[in-house]
Amino acid sequence: ISPDVDTVMYTLAGVANPETGWGIAGDTRATLDGIAAYGVDPWFLVGDRDFATHIVRTDLLRQGEPLSAVIASMAGALGVGMRILPMTDATVRTMIRVEDGWLGFQDYFVGRRHADTVLDVAFDGIDRAHPAPGVKEALLEADLVFICPSNPIVSIGPILGVPGLHEAAAEAKAPVVCISPIVGGRALKGPAAGMLAQKGHEVSAYGVAEFYGGLAPAIERLGKRVIVLQTVMGDRGDRVRFASDVMAALG
C-alpha cells in the first residue's frame, strides 16, 4: 500500500473519494465484510477497487518491477497523463514510537486512531534508499516547486529524507513554495500539530518554515517572502482558487 501515491493517482484520475480524502468514490466493501464474517476485525478500511490496486501492485513488485514503473503503468491505465513519481523504489517504512514501543504508521494512525502520544518518528530503510528515476531531475529542472500542505513530519519528511532529495530541492533554480498545513494553531486533520510540537517546533506557519529549514523559510524574519492566503480547501473549486491565488501572488 502506498497511501499518498494512491491519493494523488486517484485524484488525478478523477475517482478519488471527496468525503474521506482517500480511497475511491463509490467503492464497495464486500471484501471487508467477508473478512468480518470470519471473525477478524477489518480495521484497515480499504474498498474493493482500492484492494485491487494493492493486489495488482504487490503482484508486479513480486515479479521484480520497480515501484516507479508500476505506478507509471497503473496511472496510465486510469487515464492519468501526468507523471507520478514515488520518492524511491526502495522499501521505506514509517515507524512511530509511543509509550509501549514502536508501531507501523498505519497501526498508529488507523488502528489506534492516532490517539497515542508520539515520542519519536523513524523511517526504516531510508538510509539505504536512493531517489527513484527522474525525481532529482524533476526538482532541479522544475519551473516551480510546491511543497504541499501535507504533514511535514510523516508525509514530506520521508521524501526529503531520501539521500540527495533535500539537497536537490535546496539547489532547485525554481522558486520553492512551502504551504503550511497549520491553520489557527492546529492541523485541520491528522496528527501534524502534535508531531511538530514533539519535534520541538512551534505549531504555526513559523514552525513549519523552521522545519523545512534551508528549502524555503517562508517567514519574513527568516529572510524570505511570506504570502498569506486562504488555505482551507473543502472542494475542487477551493483547490482551483487556491492554486490560482498562489500563481498570481508569485507573479
What residue ranges belong to the model's regions?
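Short connector loops at secondary-structure junctions
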Residues: I179-P191
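An anion/phosphate-binding loop that grips the pyrophosphate of nucleotide cofactors and donors
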Residues: A142
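Structural motif
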Residues: F146-C148, V177-I179
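Active-site glycine-rich loop that binds ribose-phosphate moieties when present
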Residues: L119-L139
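C-terminal functional extensions of proteins
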Residues: K189-G251
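Electropositive, gly/pro-rich neighborhoods at or near active sites that engage anionic ligands
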Residues: I1-F123
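Charged helix-capping and loop-helix junction motifs
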Residues: I159-H166
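A short helix->loop->beta-strand "cap" motif at the edges of active sites that frequently abuts
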Residues: A172-V176, K224
